């Protein structure tokens, strides 16, 4: 996979930020790792964390919407692995559209840590395990927190 163009931002000054982190439990091993990495990243940056879990990716937007009412930034983590039906496309499109709409409607940044992969190997490679080439739980958290700070500084 290409990391070309990936910004070199590994931390932000998150003291004073409240970050909501919600993760699905479907594809549990992968989602547990994304969840743990998001929490670790937010806490390492000094943010207060409010965390919760949902069953699947389709449940993420409604909980993100609720968290956006009280948080400075919200991170949604999940893992949708393509199967043999078009259900994958419907879930991925619905979740992405929902998370984007919530961010735009609420003015609260939403980090999208929902993996949409063709197989479990691709998901593991992006979930921040030892040996993974990417850490999307951490990356989504940094992106959401950074955006919250940018918005805070704008007139």
Swiss-Prot record:
Active site: 87 (proton donor)
The protein's Enzyme Commission number: 2.5.1.78
Domain of life, per lineage: Bacteria
Signal peptide stretch: none
The reaction(s) this protein catalyses: (2S)-2-hydroxy-3-oxobutyl phosphate + 5-amino-6-(D-ribitylamino)uracil = 6,7-dimethyl-8-(1-D-ribityl)lumazine + phosphate + 2 H2O + H(+)
Positions bound to 5-amino-6-(D-ribitylamino)uracil: 26, 57-59, 79-81, 112
Molecular function as annotated in GO: 6,7-dimethyl-8-ribityllumazine synthase activity
Protein name (record): 6,7-dimethyl-8-ribityllumazine synthase
Binding site for (2S)-2-hydroxy-3-oxobutyl phosphate: 84-85, 126
Pathway named in the protein's UniProt entry: Cofactor biosynthesis; riboflavin biosynthesis; riboflavin from 2-hydroxy-3-oxobutyl phosphate and 5-amino-6-(D-ribitylamino)uracil: step 1/2
């Amino acid at each position: 996979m290409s990391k070309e163009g990936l910004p070199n931002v590994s931390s932000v000054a998150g003291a004073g930020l409240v970050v909501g982190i919600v993760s699905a439990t479907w594809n549990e091993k992968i989602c547990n790792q994304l969840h743990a990495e998001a929490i670790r990243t937010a806490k390492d940056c000094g943010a207060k964390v409010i965390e919760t879990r949902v069953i699947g990716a389709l449940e993420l937007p409604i909980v993100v919407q609720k968290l956006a009412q009280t948080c400075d930034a919200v991170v949604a983590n999940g893992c949708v692995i393509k199967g043999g039906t078009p259900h994958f496309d419907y879930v991925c499109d619905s979740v992405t559209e929902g998370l984007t709409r919530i961010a735009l409607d609420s003015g609260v940044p939403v980090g999208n840590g929902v993996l949409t992969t063709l197989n479990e190997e691709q998901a593991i490679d992006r979930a921040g395990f030892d040996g993974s080439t990417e850490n999307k739980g951490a990356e989504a958290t940094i992106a959401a927190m950074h955006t919250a700070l940018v918005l805070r500084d704008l007139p």
